Amino acid sequence: EAINQGMDEELERDEKVFLLGEEVAQYDGAYKVSRTYYMSAGLQPVPIVFRGPNGASAGVAAQHSQCFAAWYGHCPGLKVVSPWNSEDAKGLIKSAIRDDNPVVMLENELMYGVAFELPTEAQSKDFLIPIGKEGIECEVINLRTIRPMDIEAIEASVMKTNHLVTVEGGWPQFGVGAEICARIMEGPAFNFLDAPAVRVTGADVPMPYAK
């Protein structure tokens, strides 16, 4: 409902905003779209948002349970966001629609049916969550945006706590957690670690079927 509310408000705000569904547009139209804005030095904006379920879900097994965060986050020119709660979902979908770059919004299908309290601030039509900024609660960093990644916030947390644990639903090899660990190793926060960084990931196997 938060995603729908965000889209409804943006459709009402800007007459140029519209929706397209699967296989209703001309074939091949979306290919290579991610580089257009960058390659034109910002002269040709590509304000398009791709929404879709991401990660494990009940009863869909290996065919439909992949985590695409690392896949899309690997592509220069794309912005990748991943909301956790209703506040994230509404604020990020509105920011994504207003962005001049193509944005991929990865939505956890298990969260669609979960009720979250929506703060009064988030109920405003002007509510936005900036892409590229994390959410922090008790040193738990809700990354929200996969690309661009707010590495400065992660570094600040490591320098404060002297520890790093990454948690993701995707596979361990070449994942988002691996990227975070690599950036910490390459940056100023590495010398603040009191212990090796730890990654918590999905198992390195296709997702089994379960209801």
Curated annotation (Swiss-Prot):
Its cofactor is thiamine diphosphate. K(+) binds at residues 48, 96-97, 99, 101. Gene3D superfamilies: 3.40.50.920, 3.40.50.970. It catalyses: N(6)-[(R)-lipoyl]-L-lysyl-[protein] + pyruvate + H(+) = N(6)-[(R)-S(8)-acetyldihydrolipoyl]-L-lysyl-[protein] + CO2. One of its GO terms (molecular function) is pyruvate dehydrogenase (acetyl-transferring) activity. Transmembrane segments: none annotated. It is found in: Mitochondrion matrix. SUPFAM superfamilies: Thiamin diphosphate-binding fold (THDP-binding) (SSF52518), TK C-terminal domain-like (SSF52922). GO terms for cellular component: mitochondrial matrix; pyruvate dehydrogenase complex. PANTHER family: DEHYDROGENASE RELATED (PTHR11624), PYRUVATE DEHYDROGENASE E1 COMPONENT SUBUNIT BETA, MITOCHONDRIAL (PTHR11624:SF96). The pyruvate dehydrogenase complex catalyzes the overall conversion of pyruvate to acetyl-CoA and CO(2), and thereby links the glycolytic pathway to the tricarboxylic cycle. Heterotetramer of two PDHA1 and two PDHB subunits. The heterotetramer interacts with DLAT, and is part of the multimeric pyruvate dehydrogenase complex that contains multiple copies of pyruvate dehydrogenase (E1), dihydrolipoamide acetyltransferase (DLAT, E2) and lipoamide dehydrogenase (DLD, E3). These subunits are bound to an inner core composed of about 48 DLAT and 12 PDHX molecules. Interacts with DLAT. This is Pyruvate dehydrogenase E1 component subunit beta, mitochondrial.
